[in-house]
Amino acid sequence: MSDAFDINDLKRRMEGAVNALKHDLGGLRTGRASASLLEPITIEAYGSTMPINQVANISVPESRMLSVSVWDKSMVGAVERAIRDSGLGLNPITDGMTLRIPLPELNEQRRKELVKIAHQYAEQGRIAARHVRRDGMDQLKKLEKDSVISQDESRVLSEKVQKLTDDTIAEMDKIVAVKEGEIMQV
Protein backbone atom coordinates (compact mmCIF):
# COMPACT_ATOMS: atom_id res chain seq x y z
CA MET A 1 0.00 0.00 0.00
CA SER A 2 1.02 3.58 -0.54
CA ASP A 3 2.68 5.75 2.07
CA ALA A 4 0.89 8.78 0.59
CA PHE A 5 -2.38 7.87 2.35
CA ASP A 6 -2.53 7.52 6.14
CA ILE A 7 -5.62 5.64 7.31
CA ASN A 8 -4.41 5.95 10.92
CA ASP A 9 -5.00 9.70 10.71
CA LEU A 10 -8.62 9.04 9.72
CA LYS A 11 -8.92 6.46 12.52
CA ARG A 12 -7.60 9.00 15.04
CA ARG A 13 -10.07 11.65 13.83
CA MET A 14 -12.99 9.20 14.03
CA GLU A 15 -11.94 8.21 17.56
CA GLY A 16 -12.02 11.92 18.36
CA ALA A 17 -15.64 12.06 17.15
CA VAL A 18 -16.52 9.07 19.37
CA ASN A 19 -14.82 10.70 22.38
CA ALA A 20 -16.69 13.96 21.73
CA LEU A 21 -19.96 12.00 21.69
CA LYS A 22 -19.06 10.28 24.99
CA HIS A 23 -18.25 13.66 26.53
CA ASP A 24 -21.53 15.21 25.32
CA LEU A 25 -23.56 12.25 26.59
CA GLY A 26 -21.77 12.41 29.94
CA GLY A 27 -23.42 15.78 30.56
CA LEU A 28 -26.92 14.33 30.17
CA ARG A 29 -28.73 13.44 33.36
CA THR A 30 -29.70 9.88 34.03
CA GLY A 31 -31.53 8.43 37.01
CA ARG A 32 -28.24 8.16 38.93
CA ALA A 33 -25.96 10.88 40.24
CA SER A 34 -22.75 11.35 38.28
CA ALA A 35 -19.94 13.86 38.74
CA SER A 36 -19.80 14.31 34.95
CA LEU A 37 -23.24 15.95 35.16
CA LEU A 38 -21.61 19.13 36.50
CA GLU A 39 -18.57 19.13 34.16
CA PRO A 40 -20.07 21.54 31.58
CA ILE A 41 -20.73 24.17 34.28
CA THR A 42 -18.34 27.12 34.29
CA ILE A 43 -17.73 29.55 37.15
CA GLU A 44 -16.83 33.25 37.05
CA ALA A 45 -13.79 33.24 39.31
CA TYR A 46 -10.74 35.41 39.84
CA GLY A 47 -11.55 37.55 36.80
CA SER A 48 -11.97 34.66 34.36
CA THR A 49 -14.26 31.77 33.52
CA MET A 50 -13.18 28.29 34.57
CA PRO A 51 -14.71 24.81 34.81
CA ILE A 52 -16.30 23.89 38.13
CA ASN A 53 -13.74 21.12 38.72
CA GLN A 54 -10.99 23.78 38.97
CA VAL A 55 -12.59 25.46 41.98
CA ALA A 56 -14.21 22.49 43.73
CA ASN A 57 -14.16 18.74 44.23
CA ILE A 58 -17.26 16.86 43.02
CA SER A 59 -18.25 13.56 44.62
CA VAL A 60 -21.24 11.22 44.68
CA PRO A 61 -22.02 10.27 48.31
CA GLU A 62 -25.38 8.67 47.44
CA SER A 63 -27.12 7.50 44.28
CA ARG A 64 -29.33 10.62 44.15
CA MET A 65 -26.97 13.16 45.71
CA LEU A 66 -23.97 15.13 44.49
CA SER A 67 -21.56 16.85 46.84
CA VAL A 68 -19.48 19.83 45.73
CA SER A 69 -16.67 20.82 48.12
CA VAL A 70 -15.54 24.33 47.21
CA TRP A 71 -11.88 25.03 47.97
CA ASP A 72 -12.19 28.80 48.47
CA LYS A 73 -14.92 30.12 50.80
CA SER A 74 -15.35 33.25 48.66
CA MET A 75 -16.34 31.06 45.69
CA VAL A 76 -19.27 29.22 47.36
CA GLY A 77 -21.85 31.79 46.19
CA ALA A 78 -20.56 31.82 42.61
CA VAL A 79 -20.55 28.01 42.42
CA GLU A 80 -24.08 27.80 43.85
CA ARG A 81 -25.31 30.44 41.36
CA ALA A 82 -23.68 28.68 38.42
CA ILE A 83 -25.29 25.35 39.36
CA ARG A 84 -28.74 26.98 39.75
CA ASP A 85 -28.38 28.82 36.42
CA SER A 86 -27.05 25.78 34.53
CA GLY A 87 -30.46 24.76 33.19
CA LEU A 88 -30.15 21.31 34.75
CA GLY A 89 -32.97 21.98 37.22
CA LEU A 90 -30.72 21.53 40.26
CA ASN A 91 -31.09 23.33 43.62
CA PRO A 92 -27.95 23.12 45.74
CA ILE A 93 -28.15 23.26 49.54
CA THR A 94 -25.24 25.20 51.05
CA ASP A 95 -23.59 23.67 54.10
CA GLY A 96 -20.49 25.73 54.89
CA MET A 97 -18.02 25.18 52.06
CA THR A 98 -19.92 22.15 50.77
CA LEU A 99 -22.91 22.19 48.45
CA ARG A 100 -25.22 19.21 48.59
CA ILE A 101 -27.27 18.74 45.44
CA PRO A 102 -30.22 16.36 45.65
CA LEU A 103 -31.21 15.01 42.24
CA PRO A 104 -34.98 14.90 41.79
CA GLU A 105 -36.61 11.97 39.98
CA LEU A 106 -36.89 12.49 36.24
CA ASN A 107 -40.46 12.41 34.97
CA GLU A 108 -41.36 10.49 31.80
CA GLN A 109 -41.57 13.62 29.63
CA ARG A 110 -38.12 14.84 30.71
CA ARG A 111 -36.66 11.37 30.10
CA LYS A 112 -38.00 11.42 26.54
CA GLU A 113 -36.56 14.91 25.99
CA LEU A 114 -33.15 13.69 27.21
CA VAL A 115 -33.33 10.69 24.85
CA LYS A 116 -34.06 13.09 21.96
CA ILE A 117 -31.05 15.19 22.94
CA ALA A 118 -28.90 12.03 23.11
CA HIS A 119 -30.02 11.12 19.58
CA GLN A 120 -29.14 14.64 18.39
CA TYR A 121 -25.65 14.25 19.85
CA ALA A 122 -25.38 10.87 18.10
CA GLU A 123 -26.38 12.39 14.78
CA GLN A 124 -23.74 15.12 15.21
CA GLY A 125 -21.19 12.35 15.86
CA ARG A 126 -22.27 10.41 12.76
CA ILE A 127 -22.03 13.57 10.66
CA ALA A 128 -18.50 14.18 12.00
CA ALA A 129 -17.52 10.59 11.09
CA ARG A 130 -18.96 11.02 7.59
CA HIS A 131 -16.98 14.25 7.15
CA VAL A 132 -13.81 12.36 8.03
CA ARG A 133 -14.79 9.65 5.51
CA ARG A 134 -15.42 12.27 2.82
CA ASP A 135 -12.00 13.85 3.50
CA GLY A 136 -10.37 10.42 3.16
CA MET A 137 -12.22 9.62 -0.07
CA ASP A 138 -11.29 13.02 -1.53
CA GLN A 139 -7.65 12.36 -0.63
CA LEU A 140 -7.79 8.98 -2.38
CA LYS A 141 -9.37 10.45 -5.52
CA LYS A 142 -6.68 13.13 -5.69
CA LEU A 143 -3.88 10.58 -5.19
CA GLU A 144 -5.39 8.35 -7.89
CA LYS A 145 -5.84 11.31 -10.27
CA ASP A 146 -2.22 12.37 -9.70
CA SER A 147 -1.12 8.76 -10.38
CA VAL A 148 0.40 8.40 -6.92
CA ILE A 149 -1.69 5.26 -6.28
CA SER A 150 -3.30 2.82 -8.70
CA GLN A 151 -7.03 2.41 -9.21
CA ASP A 152 -6.89 -0.97 -7.43
CA GLU A 153 -5.08 0.53 -4.43
CA SER A 154 -7.63 3.34 -4.34
CA ARG A 155 -10.53 0.87 -4.33
CA VAL A 156 -8.98 -1.25 -1.54
CA LEU A 157 -8.26 1.83 0.58
CA SER A 158 -11.77 3.20 -0.11
CA GLU A 159 -13.24 -0.04 1.22
CA LYS A 160 -11.06 0.25 4.34
CA VAL A 161 -12.21 3.84 4.88
CA GLN A 162 -15.85 2.78 4.47
CA LYS A 163 -15.41 -0.10 6.93
CA LEU A 164 -13.76 2.24 9.44
CA THR A 165 -16.71 4.64 9.06
CA ASP A 166 -19.28 1.84 9.46
CA ASP A 167 -17.49 0.52 12.57
CA THR A 168 -17.29 4.01 14.09
CA ILE A 169 -20.99 4.70 13.50
CA ALA A 170 -21.90 1.28 14.93
CA GLU A 171 -19.84 2.07 18.05
CA MET A 172 -21.62 5.43 18.40
CA ASP A 173 -25.02 3.74 18.06
CA LYS A 174 -24.05 1.26 20.78
CA ILE A 175 -22.93 4.07 23.12
CA VAL A 176 -26.20 5.97 22.59
CA ALA A 177 -28.29 2.82 23.14
CA VAL A 178 -26.58 2.29 26.52
CA LYS A 179 -27.14 5.94 27.47
CA GLU A 180 -30.79 5.72 26.39
CA GLY A 181 -31.22 2.68 28.64
CA GLU A 182 -29.69 4.59 31.57
CA ILE A 183 -31.98 7.58 30.98
CA MET A 184 -35.17 5.53 30.67
CA GLN A 185 -34.37 3.36 33.71
CA VAL A 186 -36.75 4.29 36.52
From Swiss-Prot:
Alphabetical list of InterPro entries matching this protein: Ribosome_recyc_fac (IPR002661), Ribosome_recyc_fac_dom (IPR023584), RRF_sf (IPR036191)
Subcellular location: Cytoplasm
GO biological processes: cytoplasmic translational termination
Record keyword Iron present: no
Pfam families reported for this sequence: RRF
Source organism superkingdom: Bacteria
Main localization, broad class: cytoplasm
Keywords (A to Z) from UniProt: Cytoplasm, Protein biosynthesis
CDD domains (alphabetical): RRF
GO-annotated cellular components: cytosol
UniProt-recorded Gene Ontology molecular function terms: ribosomal large subunit binding
Purpose: Responsible for the release of ribosomes from messenger RNA at the termination of protein biosynthesis. May increase the efficiency of translation by recycling ribosomes from one round of translation to another.
PANTHER family: MITOCHONDRIAL RIBOSOME RECYCLING FACTOR PSEUDO 1, RIBOSOME RECYCLING FACTOR
Matching NCBIfam families: frr
Family stated for the protein in its record: Belongs to the RRF family.
Name recorded for this polypeptide: Ribosome-recycling factor
UniProt organism field: Brucella canis (strain ATCC 23365 / NCTC 10854 / RM-666)
Gene: frr
